[in-house]
Amino acid sequence: MKKIAEAWPIVKGDYTVGNPESRIAVVTLASQINSLPEAALWGSSKTENLGVEKIIINTISNSNIRYILICGKESRGHLAGHSLLAIHANGIDEKGRIVGSEGAIPFIENISREAVKRFQQQVVLLDRIGLTNLEEIMKIVREYKDQGEVYPEEPLVAISQKKRQSTFTIPHSGDIIVSEEFVMDSAAGVVCTTNDF
């Protein structure tokens, strides 16, 4: 069975890659704490939306990761750590809102409910929000780095290719004549051919 997706970690972020075979990843929230090579991934997360999405995507694409240590200082207002705990415990509603999150903008837009469910099943979160002592963090990482079995399913690559809808519209009238062939809608700042009308 394949344990790690190709090109893992899938999404870029503020993290360091350690041992991809490790059972633990470390999220230091808004704190910058020196990384240990024994963790699969080690990095910060300051937002309750994109930050949480990146953690989920990079976790479920490596079946070796079974634990996530959440430590460091919480980001003010965004509450990324609280939101990570909430999505793991409660998931997301039909609008993509993290159920139970008190973060400022706790909406997940780029991953599916299936990806969230896989995250909930694959990992155990170790809530040590506020812990910044590197020695204590090292003890936890070393305790969990080899603990447990690989998740019994292949890695799940969960990146949506959401396409943004274009906001460009052709004006229905031009208020500035540029030439016989072109007019401009000064309110929209759009130049069009006269054939478009």
Curated annotation (Swiss-Prot):
GO terms for molecular function: methyltransferase activity. This is Putative methyltransferase Mtx subunit A. Belongs to the MtrA family. It comes from Methanosarcina barkeri (strain Fusaro / DSM 804). One of its GO terms (biological process) is methylation. Keywords: Methyltransferase, Transferase. Pfam families: MtrA. Its EC number is 2.1.1.-. Transmembrane segments: none annotated. It comes from the Archaea. May be part of a complex composed of 3 subunits; MtxA, MtxH and MtxX. The gene is mtxA.
